[in-house]
Regions:
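Helix-to-loop junction immediately C-terminal to a conserved catalytic motif
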Residues: 51
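Conserved ABC transporter NBD signature motif
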Residues: 59-69, 75-76
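Conserved ABC ATPase "signature" region
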Residues: 100, 104, 110-125
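Catalytic Walker B motif of ABC-type/P-loop ATPase nucleotide-binding domains
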Residues: 154-158
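Helical segment within the ABC ATPase nucleotide-binding domain
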Residues: 169-182
Length: 197
């Protein structure tokens, strides 16, 4: 299988302190790939570099067979869904309204909203205000936003953080099914070994 993500000696320093130091990472197509490390190890920084949100101090990133740069960043991100740190959404709007905004921003047909709601098991709660959602439901909504447009790659930064045991199990099952249900490769970070296994 060809890799969907490759990093070559990827580095990031803040004020001379290395946060990511010569990371060589290869994520094969069609899998769920775990990225494990303790808190403060640079996982979120790495994921932000993969998305072009943080510029590396050194090294390079290849996404979907192309070296990530300013010229192709937007085109590559149209094929990439992400949930970095915590889910965002307008609490005073419904899930469907939030997804409509994201679909418009991504220039994705609103018909895709029903598909992603079904994948994340939020169809029956689609017309509830997001402010009434549990954290697990907000996380699933964040994943639904990432799935709009049927991306080839999903980058999920600690998506089970703060969830109760039932929410963690539900999220694990959802993520494990992604390559089969959506065709997307998934990169997931965690500081818990049991989570990645």
């Amino acid at each position: 299988m060809k890799p969907v993500i490759e990093t070559h000696a990827l580095c990031k320093s803040y004020h001379g302190r290395p946060v990511v130091d010569h990371l060589n990472l290869t994520v094969p197509e069609g899998c769920v790939y775990g990225f494990l490390g303790p808190n403060g190890a640079g996982k979120s920084t790495t994921m932000k570099m993969l998305l072009g949100l943080v510029h590396p101090t050194g090294g390079s990133v290849e996404l979907l067979g192309h070296t990530l740069n300013e010229a192709n960043r937007i085109a590559l991100l149209r094929q990439t869904g992400s949930l970095i740190e915590s889910p965002s959404g307008y609490l005073h709007l419904t899930a469907r309204e939030n997804l409509s905004i994201v679909a418009d921003l991504k220039d994705v047909d609103r018909k895709d909203i029903s598909r992603v709601l079904e994948i994340v098991h939020l169809t029956k709660d689609a017309d509830r205000k997001v402010g009434q959602y549990s954290l697990g439901m907000k996380q699933r909504l964040g994943i639904a936003m990432a799935l709009l447009g049927n991306p080839k790659l999903l980058i999920l930064d600690e998506p089970t953080n703060g969830l109760d045991p039932a929410g963690i199990q539900e999220m694990r099952s959802l993520i494990a099914s992604m390559p089969q249900t959506t065709g997307a490769t998934v990169l997931i970070s965690s500081h818990l070994l049991g989570e990645i296994e």
